[in-house]
Amino acid sequence: MRNVQDQPLVSPTEPMIDPFGRAVTYLRVSVTDRCDFRCTYCMAEHMTFLPKKDLLTLEELDRLCSVFIEKGVRKLRLTGGEPLVRKNIMHLIGNLSRHLKSGALDELTLTTNGSQLARFAGELADCGVRRINVSLDTLNPEKFRTITRWGDLSRVLEGIDAAQKAAIHVKINAVALKDFNDAEIPELIRWAHGRGMDVTLIETMPMGEIEFDRTDQYLPLSQVRADLASQFTLADIPYRTGGPARYVTISETGGRLGFITPMTYNFCESCNRVRLTCTGMLYMCLGQNDDADLRKALRESESDEHLSQAIDEAISRKPKGHDFIIDREHNRPSVARHMSLTGG
């Protein structure tokens, strides 16, 4: 087994540039397709998860991430599924933190449902994790259990408290769902801003299994913003985090609110990211099915040059934009794979 602390990386190369002149500096890595929740817009209730043999080992994930960092990635986000349910995940995070210490990586972060944060917040902070996103769509315990199918809201809130006590900045991600949580969004904003947390609202995306009621729950954020403007004073700001969100400040709370609108506003012109699955498939776009098998390149050779070439070939196919559209007539997703596999 390669020593991840001592293994030399590939020789420095020019930053990765896609066919449309966009620098790829952000890698999102789904470390597992498993989750302890079953959120209705993310996965089916009775999911069949990948067998262990199909997953990249933690050492392989480290090697892949390290090559991407050598090729110009400055921000690394671990996702899932739920990343903190992957066995020995802190070993991987601890190893990856060496890139923060060397200055090769600007940020190591993760998106989580919060269920495991009370257990891991201190270790995450010790590894240099300074910011995390927590997915939280409602503060109503009954609705929370409905949308997550299995989730316990109190456990998530305990996790958020633990993260903040560990000096980790928490941002709340909420999917806006028509006739489910739309009336609660102002309350969620006040609650989060009152605790020093930004909020980002997200439109539901047509990925994976789409049930009839889910299609009907699509809520354009343009409508949400108009509703919020009747209660709050919103001011556009140029704040950016390297992602697709457009931000406003809310005068009444003093906090920031982001909008991610893949369905009503195409943010592709500034896309700086690619997504790696736990099986080693690289997706150049969340809303396209084109992929590259990096597991094959990873296991064919100990040479990182071979892996680097496979990454370059994949980046050369990064598309101009996504294909998201909700097909109400046929009730089918525009992208068949589940968000839990691609990484939310």
UniProtKB/Swiss-Prot annotation:
Which InterPro entries is this protein grouped with? Aldolase_TIM (IPR013785), Elp3/MiaA/NifB-like_rSAM (IPR006638), MoaA (IPR013483), MoaA_NifB_PqqE_Fe-S-bd_CS (IPR000385), MoaA_twitch (IPR010505), MoCo_biosynth_MoaA/MoaC (IPR050105), rSAM (IPR007197)
Query: Which residues take part in binding [4Fe-4S] cluster 2?
Result: C268, C271, C285
- Residue numbers binding S-adenosyl-L-methionine: Y41, G81, S135, M205
Q: Which residues bind GTP?
A: R28, R77, T111, K171, R273, V274, R275
Write out the GO MF terms.
Answer: 4 iron, 4 sulfur cluster binding; cyclic pyranopterin monophosphate synthase activity; GTP 3',8'-cyclase activity; GTP binding; metal ion binding; S-adenosyl-L-methionine binding
Enzyme Commission no: 4.1.99.22
Has keyword Amino-acid biosynthesis?
no
Q: Which enzyme class?
A: lyase
Protein family according to the UniProt entry: Belongs to the radical SAM superfamily. MoaA family.
Q: What does this protein do?
A: Catalyzes the cyclization of GTP to (8S)-3',8-cyclo-7,8-dihydroguanosine 5'-triphosphate.
Name of the molecule in the record: GTP 3',8-cyclase
